[in-house]
Curated annotation (Swiss-Prot):
Pfam families: DUF4504. Belongs to the UPF0739 family. PANTHER family: UPF0739 PROTEIN C1ORF74. It comes from Danio rerio. It comes from the Eukaryota. This is UPF0739 protein C1orf74 homolog.
Length: 259
């Protein structure tokens, strides 16, 4: 990995990722770069880009600039689904999804609005079908993949995005009942994972993962999340670019939760 200057990376991000909605701040530019580096290093399978509404083509342009500067490898891909754009490490993603299909061990949390409280449910067949359908498209090897609505119109994208991002648990709800959920005023355990990246004199801190689990279900999923944490530590130890990994946990209660 070539150590480009912070100014060069910030300038490239602001140039490539310009948007009518929002100009990226220098700090945001470096955070985006850290996320992409983490994907490239296999610390996380994918990044959902939601910083300022930049298009998939703009993201591809920025990714190419990072690749040309040898900041990241040439193996990353971009996928767009329902106006959401992901940057994906194909090898890590295939391994991640293959293991998921084999074990079917991902805890799904049913938060249908018709329920009084969230409950754990088995790995739904619909979730398995989403993963298999995605892999069939993803295996075509294109650098930029745009999923057609016909493919994902019946998918629960909340569940699917949680799977793609490598979360140790994902929310699920019956879409035919609407998109509301039963998490209002429900205590949630919010887990975050932080890292640092030193580039010249700057030590940039970044939140790599943030996910939640209803507090009343924590004891049921704690062992699974601990295994996920141990596996993440193992992957993190195989690289030296990112440092100071830190895990934190807080409990919050909100009047409404958007998934």
């Amino acid at each position: 990995m070539v150590a480009s200057s912070p100014e060069t990376l910030i300038s490239a991000a602001q140039k490539c990722l310009c948007s009518r909605k929002k100009r990226l701040s220098p700090s945001s530019c470096l955070e985006v770069t850290i996320h992409i580096i983490a994907v490239d290093l296999g610390v996380k399978p994918a990044l959902l880009y939601d910083s300022n509404g930049a298009s998939p083509d703009q993201l591809q342009l920025y990714l190419h600039s990072l690749q040309e500067s040898s900041v990241v490898s040439n193996s990353l891909r971009i996928m767009s689904i329902n106006d959401n754009t992901f940057i994906i490490n194909p090898d890590i993603m295939k391994s991640h999804l293959g293991e998921l299909l084999k074990s079917k061990s991902l805890p799904l949390i049913d938060v249908c609005s018709s329920r009084k409280r969230p409950v754990l449910c088995a790995f739904e067949r619909s979730a398995e079908e989403m993963v298999r359908s995605f892999l069939e498209v993803f295996m075509n090897g294109l650098d930029l993949v745009v999923l057609e609505e016909e493919l994902y119109k019946d998918w629960n994208l909340c569940t699917f995005f949680g799977i793609l991002l490598g979360y140790p648990a994902s929310y699920w709800f019956e879409q035919t009942q609407g998109f509301e959920n039963c998490l209002s005023m429900t205590p949630l355990v919010v887990c975050t994972v932080w890292v640092r990246w030193q580039i010249h004199e700057i030590k940039q801190r970044c939140c790599l993962y943030s996910f939640s689990v209803p507090e009343e279900l924590w004891s049921d999923v704690q062992s699974h999340i601990q295994r996920w944490t141990d596996h993440l530590r193992e992957r993190f130890s195989k690289q030296t670019v990112l440092t100071d990994i830190c895990f934190s946990r807080d409990t919050v209660t909100l009047p409404s939760v958007t998934l």
